Amino acid sequence: YGYNIRSWTRSISGSLFNQTLYYQDQLEGNTPCYNGNISSVLWKAGPSNNESGYRFTYDGLNRMKNAIYGETNSLSVNPNRFNEQITAYDKKGNILGLLRYGQTSSSEYGLIDNLNLTYDGNQLQAVKDNATHSVFGNGMEFKDGANQTIEYAYDKNGNLTKDLNKKIAVIQYNLLNLPSQVIFVDGNVIEYEYGSDGRKLRTAHVINGVTSITDYCGNAIYENGSLKMLLNEA
């Protein structure tokens, strides 16, 4: 990690991922920020030397308004393909409207999410997606899986206990407020086990009545009793 004179994170360097954060630094097309807001970010991942990134703009209350995508160190190649725009906030600072852009076909890019969000206090109650296009291939987008006034529920600690957009009927928690069981509307279940320090030790997926077990032992991950992978810093 690299830092500037204000101790703000400036860069992350590794064999598989590199990232540079810009604040008041000049990068073509950005608006320098002297208050700690990030004005731009560049990154590259894997063996590729191709850089991608975003320029950011903020409103008068330092709330993000736009994330403007581009490629190369000038962010001038393939511009706007994966832009994001926050269209409105409520008085508490909660996001009310969000536009996301992405790949809509093998050669086209456009709007993939047009989200309207409603709240009870600061707790999200429902999300409606008015976008007409879906993301291409295996890209990520919001999946509008429900059309109800209340699509999310919470317990007294503020933990999420229901998410109808993800088809989750019930989420149960242990005494450490860590999720212990997730029950889906189709009857499938995910169960979690933890150590006394909160570290996750086991995950059990029960899918169509068939159980698969994943155990976490330090940097070793086992699936159904067989070593699956060893985690290490490349």
Give the ranges of each region predicted by the language model.
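Beta-turn initiation residues at beta-strand->coil junctions
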Residues: Y1, I5, S11-L16, S40-P47, ...
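Buried hydrophobic residues that stabilize the cores of well-folded domains
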Residues: Y1-Y3, E28-G29, E84-I86, I95-G97
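Short secondary-structure transition motifs
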Residues: I5-G14, K91-Y119, Q172-A234
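Short, ordered secondary-structure scaffold segments
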Residues: Q19-S52, Y58, T118-K166, V210-A234
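Short, surface-exposed coil-to-beta transition loops
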Residues: N50-S52, F82, I112
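Extracellular/surface-associated beta-sandwich interaction domains
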Residues: N66, R81-E84, K91, Q181
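Short glycine-/Asp-/Thr-/Trp-enriched loop segments that recur within the blades
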Residues: S74-F82
